[in-house]
Amino acid sequence: MANGADRLDLDGKPIKPMTICMIGAGGFIGSHLCEKLMTETPHKVLALDVYNDKIKHLLEPDTVQWAGRIQFHRINIKHDSRLEGLIKMADLTINLAAICTPADYNTRPLDTIYSNFIDALPVVKYCSENNKRLIHFSTCEVYGKTIGSFLPKDHPLRQDPEFYVLKEDISPCIFGSIEKQRWSYACAKQLIERLVYAEGAENGLEFTIVRPFNWIGPRMDFIPGIDGPSEGVPRVLACFSNNLLRREPLKLVDGGESQRTFIYIKDAIEAVLLMIENPERANGHIFNVGNPNNEVTVRQLAEMMTEVYAKVSGETAIESPTIDVSSKEFYGEGYDDSDKRIPDMTIINRQLGWNPKTSLWDLLESTLTYQHTTYAEAIKKATSKPVAS
């Protein structure tokens, strides 16, 4: 751990140790952020979540150098009177809690809206009323569809970055019809962003809003039937990983034509740490955090993951590595999607001097090595069990 006195912010000022209330600390992003804070900073973390499986390695040993700097509080923020007290104890609150799995957006729209808007309201309220700084995690989905997606497919302007690159302070938020309940998540996230922004404008709340663009890496989501429900449908990286581990074809929804950018979780966490430790540069800003250099179609992602997994596992790919399925078949009625999600990086580069570093191949190799090491044997055991007669 670096000594607090030795650490300077981007303007050369000493970084003072702080206490951080992290809501959703036991999830994918939270676990990596907790690791970063424990190993590289003197800050304390009040880790709030329902589960702590992904941060147990930070909590159990009493002899580690950060013993006493991280406390786990088992809390469901929907109904727990301790929440305001924990926010009061901290200098900064980071809210990571959310339902953020596309398979849930149109099959569990009420839970999605409540989780991402209603349940977040007290967090914003307590931070504002107690003059506590807030870093709120939103999503790139608030942008919805690109302007270019409404042009004919062969229209030359579809290739103009002005029609598809997403800018925090300029790009409109364009959603589908109400019947397309897939947008329940994006709409709830946009509304809580507007509330946070309004609290800043009217009541002086110090805030930063983060819009992640497909952060991927170890510990993302779950593998169905191993450390998650058998019928569960995780996000694309874990979904494809599950198929590869089970030697099943990777399912490409609507042909896998949607384009996405992917960023390594460790790169993204570097950006978040800069926001935490440079409040004068981060307050009042919305930041895209993604890697525009790692743009691929979902089909290309599947092909690359198949190739990388063959390398890390030593197994040859199956004869038909992908299969096309309709969005209705995969996600159910009411699904819709955005064609491209390419972040503009101007604001985060100007304010924090941050740029992502890890190539798509390297981040997939690191992540799939973890997936294979962690899950391959468990899946073999699960699939080799005799069926009861």
Swiss-Prot record:
GO terms for cellular component: apoplast; cytoplasm; cytosol; extracellular region. NAD(+) binds at F28, I29, D49, N76, I77, L96, Y185, K189, W215, R235. The keyword Acyltransferase does not apply. It catalyses: UDP-alpha-D-glucuronate + H(+) = UDP-alpha-D-xylose + CO2; UDP-alpha-D-glucuronate + H(+) = UDP-alpha-D-apiose + CO2. The keyword Glycoprotein does not apply. Its EC number is 4.1.1.35. Its main location: cytoplasm. UDP-alpha-D-glucuronate binds at Y105, T139, E141, R182, Y185, N214, K251, V253, R260, Y331, Y335, D337, R341. This is UDP-D-apiose/UDP-D-xylose synthase 2.
